[in-house]
UniProtKB/Swiss-Prot annotation:
It holds the Pfam family Rota_NSP3. This is Non-structural protein 3. Residues 170-234 are annotated as: Interaction with host ZC3H7B. It comes from the Viruses.
Length: 315
């Protein structure tokens, strides 16, 4: 039987392996370009960026949440699995949606567009006024819904700070950036290609993990069908056993009271719950052995009173 959190641990292991692959890719790229580097510094930089992108985009919590649903189903807690059954009936639909959403979130996070900027951009839009330098800020439907739900608060700690005069020579700065652009272009393209390969590998891992869900659900359904069949077979076997014993008991030349007592014990066997039925059978067998023991002791005492001797076995 699987452990309580085996699927969740597998998902965490895949994410950790993806991080290690990112570190190896970064160091390999630097070595190929002949750039000296400090491994601990590269490791720290990649870890900070990787943790931020995975957490801010929600990619980390997505497979872990699905893994928790699988673990709960494997431990006979089907509430979460049933709620997601209809949505996950078509595996291509959630796989495609998750792939597209995760890809967009990671691209935005890697470019410095964090969750705060994405939420603000989704809540507001700006409309320019023709012929004027001012503009109109419009609230989107998402902002209206948040207002209705009471999810908007007023920040009373706003402080009007003094604006400093910008004295930067933008023309000189632009010329410097233009000179560096060509030298950085090839390096940026190489980093981007490496990132695409890592993202594609991660998407493949996520897709494989999502395919586990319907497989596990089918396996659980098969186990339930087998368990129901086994329980019915045991119930039929127990019913057949009690009927056979009752028929055999009626054919014996025993006292009617003894027959009635044994028949009452047999009828007390629970034919619905197999576990209880085995306990009842054990009790009946123990009672029969106890009655036989008492009969033997009575017969032994009678022989001794008649001054006879007895022995076991054949001489």
């Amino acid at each position: 039987m699987l452990k309580m959190e085996s699927t969740q641990q597998m998902a965490v292991s895949i994410i950790n392996s993806s991080f290690e692959a990112a570190v190896v890719a970064a160091t390999s790229a630097l070595e190929n370009m002949g750039i000296e580097y400090d491994y601990q510094d590269i490791y720290s930089r990649v870890k900070n960026k990787f943790d931020f992108v995975m957490d801010d985009s929600g990619v980390k919590n997505n497979p872990i949440g699905k893994a928790i649903t699988i673990d709960q189903a494997l431990n006979n807690k089907f509430g979460s699995a049933i709620r997601n059954r209809n949505w996950l009936a078509d595996t291509s639909r959630p796989a495609k949606l998750d792939e597209d959403v995760n890809k967009l979130r990671m691209m935005l996070s890697s470019k410095g567009i964090d969750q705060k900027m994405r939420v603000l951009n989704a809540c507001f839009s700006v409309k320019r006024i023709p012929g004027k330098s001012s503009s109109i800020i419009k609230c989107t439907k998402l902002m209206r819904d948040k207002l209705e739900r009471g999810e908007v608060e007023v920040d009373d700690s706003f402080v009007d700070e003094k604006m400093e005069v910008d004295t930067i020579d933008w023309k000189s700065r632009y010329e410097q950036l233009e000179q560096r652009f060509e030298s950085l272009k090839s390096r940026v393209n190489e980093k981007y290609n490496n990132w695409v390969l890592k993202a594609r590998k991660m998407n493949e891992n996520m897709h494989s993990l999502q395919n586990v869900i319907p497989q596990q659900q089918a396996h659980i359904a098969e186990l339930q069908v087998y368990n129901n069949k086994l329980e019915r077979d045991l119930q039929n076997k127990i019913g057949s056993l009690t009927s056979s014993i009752e028929w055999y008991l009626r054919s014996m030349e025993l006292d009617p009271e003894i027959k009635a007592d044994i028949e009452q014990q047999i009828n007390s066997i629970d034919a619905i719950n197999p576990l209880h039925a085995f306990d009842d059978l054990e009790s009946v067998i123990r009672n029969l052995i106890s009655d036989y023991d008492k009969l033997f002791l009575m017969f032994k005492g009678l022989i001794q009173r008649c001054n006879y001797q007895y022995s076991f076995g054949c001489e």
